C-alpha cells in the first residue's frame, strides 16, 4: 500500500492590489469541479464570489472554508493570485509558494522579494503542455492570451471612438499570429475592420489566415540592423515602420526575446504615420517594440506620440471582460491544482509545473531572469 502524501494548503485570493484587476483564478461557478480529495486543502478569501453574485454561504461547504486575506497569507502554503504586485510578496511569509503571473524576467522587485523570502514562484506565463518528444505543444492559458488581444483592441477602439462597421473604412496590421494575435484579429473582424494584414515571422504557407478577409505577410529581422525588421511583400523588402505607416490601426502581439528584442517603430519613424493612427501594444515590454513603449493602466490607458498618434498599452486588459477571463483562467488552472498541492515531488513529476517554476525556494531557475537582470548565477543572485 502506497504512502499517502499530505497535500499543501492553498489560499485563493479574491482581490488583487493591482488597480482595476478583477480576474479570479477559479470561477465561483467552477468550485464544484474541485476534486473531493482536494477540497479540505482549499481556502477561499471572504467575498470570493461577491462580484459574480455568488455569496460566501454558497461556497462555504464546497471548500475547507472562507477566511480573511491576512489569515490566508499567514497560514496557507500556496497562494493563488493571478496578478501579484511587489506588496503582495512583502506580505508573504518565508518559504511560501505563489502561483500566478509574476513576470519575473521584467520585474526585478518581485524577483528580489522572492529571493529574500525564499519563495517559490510557479508562473502562469511559463505553463505549457509539451509533446512526447519534449517539444512545445500549447500554452496552458492560451485563451487568456486570446482575450488580451481581443480586449486591448476592443478597449482601444472604444477609447478612440472608432469602429470599422460605421464611419470611414479602417485597415489594421497585426504583428504576430499566436494566441494574442488571434484574439486581436477576432476583435478587429467583429468590429467591422475588413482590411487586416497579419505579419508573421513564420513561412506564410504554413500559417492559416485567422479570418477570411485577413492577408498574411512575412517579416524578418533586417540583416543590416538585427533590432529592426523588414516586411517581405510583392514589392520586395520594405522597412517594417514604413509598411505599418499605411494602416489606421497597428496591433503588436509579439512575445519579445528579452535578450534580443525587436524594434518596430521609433520616434524618428512617426512623421510617416497619419494623425489619428492607433497603436495597440498588447504585448508591451518597456522600451521594446516601440522606442516609447511602457505599460499603461485602466486609469490612464492611452497617451499620444508624434502628431496625434494614440498609444494603448494596458498590461492586464483581459480584466476588461473579467467574468469571461476568469472562466477561461479557471478552465486552464483546475487540471493542475492537484499537482501543485501535491508539493515538490508532484511538481517534479509534472512537466508543465516543473518547467513553470521560475524561482524555487528563492533560487532562480529561469536563466532569462539572470541574463536580463544581470544577476549572478549563485544564490542570493546579486546584481552584477
Segments predicted by a language model, with ranges:
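An N-terminal-biased, well-structured beta-alpha scaffold segment characteristic
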Residues: 2, 6-113
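A short helix->loop->beta-strand "cap" motif at the edges of active sites that frequently abuts
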Residues: 39-40, 93-97, 116-119, 193, ...
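Short glycine-/small-residue-rich Rossmann-like dinucleotide-binding loops
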Residues: 83-84, 102-103, 254-258, 283-284, ...
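Rossmann-like adenosine-cofactor binding region
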Residues: 205-307
Amino acid at each position: 500500500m502506497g504512502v499517502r502524501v499530505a497535500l499543501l494548503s492553498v489560499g485563493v485570493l479574491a482581490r488583487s492590489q493591482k488597480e482595476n484587476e478583477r480576474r479570479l483564478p477559479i470561477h465561483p461557478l467552477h468550485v464544484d469541479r474541485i476534486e473531493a480529495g482536494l477540497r479540505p486543502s482549499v481556502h477561499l478569501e471572504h467575498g470570493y464570489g461577491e462580484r459574480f453574485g455568488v455569496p460566501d454561504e454558497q461556497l462555504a461547504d464546497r471548500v475547507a472554508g472562507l477566511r480573511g486575506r491576512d489569515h490566508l497569507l499567514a497560514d496557507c502554503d500556496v497562494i493563488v493570485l493571478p496578478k501579484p504586485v511587489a506588496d503582495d510578496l512583502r506580505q508573504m511569509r518565508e518559504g511560501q509558494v505563489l502561483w500566478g503571473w509574476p513576470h519575473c524576467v521584467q520585474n526585478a522587485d518581485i524577483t528580489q522579494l522572492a529571493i529574500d523570502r525564499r519563495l517559490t514562484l510557479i508562473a502562469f506565463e511559463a505553463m505549457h503542455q509539451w509533446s512526447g518528444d519534449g517539444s512545445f505543444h500549447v500554452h496552458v492559458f492560451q485563451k487568456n492570451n486570446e482575450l488580451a488581444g481581443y480586449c486591448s483592441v476592443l478597449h482601444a477602439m472604444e477609447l478612440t471612438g472608432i469602429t470599422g462597421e460605421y464611419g470611414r473604412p479602417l485597415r489594421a496590421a497585426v504583428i504576430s499570429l499566436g494566441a494574442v494575435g488571434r484574439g486581436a484579429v477576432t476583435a478587429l473582424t467583429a468590429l467591422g475592420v475588413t482590411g487586416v494584414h497579419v505579419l508573421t515571422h513564420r513561412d506564410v504557407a504554413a500559417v492559416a489566415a485567422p479570418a477570411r478577409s485577413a492577408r498574411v505577410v512575412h517579416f524578418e529581422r533586417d540583416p543590416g540592423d538585427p533590432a529592426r525588421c523588414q516586411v517581405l511583400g510583392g514589392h520586395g523588402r520594405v522597412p517594417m515602420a514604413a509598411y505599418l505607416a499605411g494602416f489606421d490601426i497597428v496591433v503588436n502581439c509579439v512575445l519579445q526575446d528579452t535578450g534580443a528584442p525587436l524594434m518596430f517603430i521609433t520616434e524618428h519613424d512617426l512623421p510617416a504615420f497619419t494623425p489619428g493612427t492607433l497603436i495597440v501594444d498588447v504585448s508591451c515590454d518597456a522600451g521594446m517594440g516601440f522606442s516609447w513603449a511602457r505599460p499603461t493602466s485602466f486609469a490612464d490607458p492611452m497617451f499620444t506620440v508624434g502628431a496625434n498618434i494614440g498609444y494603448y498599452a494596458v498590461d492586464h486588459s483581459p480584466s476588461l471582460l473579467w467574468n469571461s477571463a476568469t472562466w477561461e483562467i479557471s478552465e486552464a488552472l483546475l487540471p493542475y491544482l492537484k499537482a501543485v498541492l501535491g508539493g515538490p515531488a508532484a511538481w517534479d513529476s509534472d512537466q508543465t509545473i516543473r518547467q513553470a517554476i521560475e524561482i524555487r525556494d528563492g533560487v532562480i531557475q529561469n536563466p532569462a531572469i539572470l541574463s536580463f537582470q544581470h544577476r549572478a548565477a549563485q544564490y542570493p543572485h546579486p546584481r552584477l
